[in-house]
């Protein structure tokens, strides 16, 4: 639900409560159990659901050919993933990070609209995402602990309050889009999105599980009116391949030992939808 208030002919504000739902499952992470504060709750426990709540506010202003908007959304406070309390920091807590942003749209011609916006995602507000992964020495110590059965050698066990995470930082997201209403039947759209990789190269190891390395993606699509009351929309998205790699070098008692981790990804997505007006 949304509550909106029109201040005057040009300015409006709105408020929405946000209800969150997450579902998670993990398989094949048995090797991570040796690094966990709760080894039985790391992997192969089926689906786990979490619910939560937050809030969002927004502003929209229209001034001739220009429209401007701004929004802010609180953290969405989620239930813990109790079945995976030994995987995510704070006993399975995995809140949705807060975000804020602003944008502008320009009606360049009667048919062409150009829009741009920027937003900030505050990953640092969620420990499961922002906690750093192990250094080389911490990993070698934990591996030694797993071999000899000494969990005290694991500096920040998975699932603990300071448990190892993905090391994500806050990021800025930039978007540019165009909308061209060719005629009453056809509308064409295109867009570009850029956001830096949210983690440093030395966090590549644990991000094998969540390789968010894509920085740029483009979209193109159209809407075709079939009848006065129905339409079909098609969108294609391509995310350009990006790579992150790092070689971890041990020091002190682990001098001479090393290992490497590499993350890479590209994406293709095609979406088709059909709409009806009642």
PLM region descriptions:
Residues 1-278:
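Outer-membrane beta-barrel porins/channels
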């Amino acid at each position: 639900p949304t509550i909106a208030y029109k201040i005057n002919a040009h300015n409006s504000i709105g408020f929405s409560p946000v209800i969150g739902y997450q579902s998670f499952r993990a398989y094949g992470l048995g090797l991570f159990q040796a690094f966990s504060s709760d080894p039985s709750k790391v992997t192969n426990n089926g689906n786990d659901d979490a619910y939560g709540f937050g809030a969002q506010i927004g502003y929209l202003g229209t001034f001739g050919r220009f429209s401007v908007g701004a929004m802010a959304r609180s953290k969405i406070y989620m239930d813990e993933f109790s079945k995976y309390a030994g995987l995510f920091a704070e006993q399975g807590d995995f809140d949705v990070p807060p975000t804020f942003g602003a944008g502008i749209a320009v009606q360049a011609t009667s048919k062409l609209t150009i829009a741009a916006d920027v937003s900030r995602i505050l990953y640092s507000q969620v420990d499961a995402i922002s906690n750093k992964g192990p250094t080389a020495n911490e990993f070698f110590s934990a591996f030694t602990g797993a071999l000899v059965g000494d969990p005290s050698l694991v500096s920040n066990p998975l699932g603990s309050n300071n448990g190892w995470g993905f090391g994500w930082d806050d990021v800025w997201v930039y978007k540019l889009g165009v909308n061209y209403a060719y005629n009453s039947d056809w509308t064409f759209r295109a867009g570009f999105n850029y956001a830096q990789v949210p983690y440093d190269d030395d966090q590549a190891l644990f991000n094998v599980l969540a390789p968010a390395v894509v920085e740029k993606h483009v979209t193109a699509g159209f809407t075709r009116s079939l009848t006065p009351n129905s339409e079909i929309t098609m969108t294609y998205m391509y995310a350009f391949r990006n790579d992150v790699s790092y070689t971890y070098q041990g020091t002190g008692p682990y001098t001479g030992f090393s290992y490497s981790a590499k993350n890479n990804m590209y994406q293709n997505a095609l979406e088709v939808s059909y709409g009806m007006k009642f």
